[in-house]
């Protein structure tokens, strides 16, 4: 049967099964704020572990850091965020709504079959396009707009007891700058030679004007970023390497290839510091959206911080006896956005019998929130079944469930993506075997209790 995936179905399942809840819900919520429930936090943690394993732990080039969210404000002056990290805002004079001009144009283009990309356009270019094409307000259809103005996306706060300009500080809008300012520290203490990379997972904050589509774009989000430093002249070679590495990481975790594509940025779209940028995009239920940005940032960041801090951030290459400021390749992935990708991609509906639809999340076993569910056929068998649960939980994240019919319990586990169910029945009392059910095939096999641990060995590897 053809499965129609919708955001409504994904969001409903996520809320009802304990993946993601609306933030501050008992107080009426907070716009674009989401809390991860018991299953959601396990899913996201497993995704982060899978990223860290392949990008840092198992990669001989790379090491990790965990930098502070609050940094010296001069960091953001040097990086260009204070002066240039902003969105183009425009107001509709008729209905008094505020919009991001570039996103408003993109939405209008989509509805009117205009295949024009406006990334990187100046305010003047955006305004001219709105007037020439007759772009309308998405809320009321009006054409009477204010001029476009810039809105800085950084959250500003104050450090200490006084609230004045001297105590102004920002919540970081990206994790990357913490890596750049620690480049020399990491290189010196690890004695790494170029090429090498520094990975980090952490929270970032952006005061987005048009957040939305569930956890696709939020104001508080978690990033998984790698800054890979290389010799100038080798950057495009490494750029291609990391593009393919990132794409293959997604495929290795069972993301369907037909739902992925790479889109190279045009010259007009490129950031002023970028030599090349490619987005890995995913086909969400609401259409294609950016998932993973891979950018050749050249030596912009290290050079900026060297200039503003007056510190020497160059590298002496012992192989060539040459001193240079390394170029940097940055694969930047949002943990929340890729969690949404795994939810969307894993979601499936299957007609088991006529009119009987089974909803299943076909997660790769490595990222499944619950690995094994232990289910006694009857509550009378609970004591013996619970011993199996206690044995397995020392090694795997498991659930124990004795409530409801065995069929309903299987369906509950299918809906949360549990790869295996272990059923202890009345025969188990005598033959000391249990039934192991596979989520995807629904095939069942009898396994001796003493051999359960060896049976599951390697089934959740990545």
From Swiss-Prot:
Location relative to the cell: Cytoplasm
PROSITE patterns linked to this entry: AA_TRNA_LIGASE_II (PS50862)
A Gene Ontology cellular-component term: cytoplasm
GO terms (BP aspect): glycyl-tRNA aminoacylation
Catalyzed chemical reaction(s): tRNA(Gly) + glycine + ATP = glycyl-tRNA(Gly) + AMP + diphosphate
Residues engaged in binding ATP: 206-208, 216-221, 290-291, 334-337
Keyword hit for Zinc: no
Top-tier EC class: ligase
GO molecular function annotations of the record: ATP binding; catalytic activity, acting on a protein; glycine-tRNA ligase activity; protein dimerization activity; transferase activity
EC number: 6.1.1.14
Keywords: Aminoacyl-tRNA synthetase, ATP-binding, Cytoplasm, Ligase, Nucleotide-binding, Protein biosynthesis
InterPro entries registered for this protein in UniProt: aa-tRNA-synt_IIb, aa-tRNA-synth_II, aa-tRNA-synth_II/BPL/LPL, Anticodon-bd, Anticodon-bd_dom_sf, Gly-tRNA_synthase/POLG2, Gly_tRNA_ligase_bac, GlyRS-like_core
Residues engaged in binding substrate: 100, 174, 221-225, 330-334
Function: Catalyzes the attachment of glycine to tRNA(Gly).
Assembly notes: Homodimer.
Family: Belongs to the class-II aminoacyl-tRNA synthetase family.
Protein name per its UniProtKB record: Glycine--tRNA ligase
The organism of origin for this protein: Acetivibrio thermocellus (strain ATCC 27405 / DSM 1237 / JCM 9322 / NBRC 103400 / NCIMB 10682 / NRRL B-4536 / VPI 7372) (Clostridium thermocellum)
Gene transcribed to yield this protein: glyQS
